[in-house]
Design a protein with these regions (language model features):
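N-terminal small-domain helix-loop-helix segment of the aminotransferase-like
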Residues: 5-95, 102, 276-279
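Short strand-turn motif at the edge of the Rossmann-like AdoMet-binding core
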Residues: 34, 119, 168, 199-201, ...
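Active-site phosphate-binding strand-loop segment of PLP-dependent enzymes
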Residues: 136, 142-208, 212
């Protein structure tokens, strides 16, 4: 038998895979993963067919279809008041998970520490470990799963390379407030700490709450990656299409890894989202 050391000795099949298999086996309603029990908009589905029939079946640009990046730039600017250059600050990814892994792979090296709020989406920890980093957990507190920012401050040191935030939060559903983002901004001021903001549930928010994107805060924007997904918003999780926003100097490093990770993302689907978003609120 060939001997080797596992890079993830404690990792097993994800709970999402286990629960989804059980749901299929027993024809049960699946509440374990973030996808709906109804189909995507038929117009969006038809637009994929149109794109394929129009010949968009070969490799797209590594950074993604420009028309889609331009639409994303416009939408983000309208929502949060920050302009991201579609040429140099937006990259289309093969889902948010690929974007998250690419950010971590581009910047985390052996000995780096990454603060992660727990409980957390189960991708963060193994992605950090695979790149030699160390997860520093901060546990959300109380019935409202709030953040103890004093604890965060205590855990920041010279080895802290990144803080991962996720709002609206998976799995608790808690929403970061303006006060939270301002506290974060204050803590990382005058440091080289990067922020990875997972915002895949940004448009799935209720009770008149407001999504406080990192993109609303200029001092955070300059050190942050914002990762999002069309799958959650438009009920197309199997299409694995998302995007990443970051200032040019950070996005340059992201794209270096992205090109060797997936090279590019699904071509006709990008054109479909581009056209669909142009006529969507």
């Amino acid at each position: 038998m060939i001997y080797f050391d596992s890079k993830l000795p404690n990792a097993t099949t994800t709970i999402f895979t286990i629960m989804s298999n059980l749901a299929r086996e027993h024809k049960a309603i699946n509440l374990s993963q973030g996808f709906p029990d109804f189909n995507a908009n038929q117009k969006l589905i038809d637009l994929v067919t149109v794109a394929m029939n129009n010949g968009f079946n070969q490799y797209p640009p590594v950074e993604g279809v420009l028309n889609l990046r331009e639409v994303i730039s416009q939408k983000v600017n309208e929502l949060y008041g920050t302009y991201y250059d579609p040429n140099s600050e937006i990259t289309i990814t093969s889902g948010a998970s690929q974007g998250i892994f690419t950010v971590i792979s581009a910047f985390i090296k052996k000995g780096d520490e990454v603060i992660v709020f727990q409980p957390a989406y189960d991708q963060y920890e193994p992605s950090i470990q695979l790149n030699g980093g160390k997860v520093i957990p901060v546990y959300l507190k109380g019935a409202d799963y709030s953040i103890n920012w004093e604890e965060v401050a205590d855990k920041i040191n010279s080895r802290t390379r990144m803080i991962v935030i996720n709002t609206p939060h998976n799995p608790t559903g808690t929403i970061f407030t303006k006060i939270d983002l301002l506290r974060l901004e204050s803590l990382v001021k005058d440091t080289d700490i990067l922020i990875l903001s997972d915002e895949v549930y940004a448009h799935i928010i209720y009770d008149d709450q407001i999504h406080e994107s990192v993109s609303r805060y200029p001092k955070l924007v300059e050190r942050s990656f914002v990762v999002s997904s069309f799958g959650k918003t438009f009920h197309t999780t199997g299409w694995k299409t998302g995007y990443c926003l970051a200032p040019k100097n950070l996005m340059t490093e992201f794209r270096k890894v992205h090109q060797f990770n997936v090279f590019c993302s699904n071509h006709p689907i990008q054109h479909a989202f581009s056209e669909f978003l142009k006529c969507s609120d």
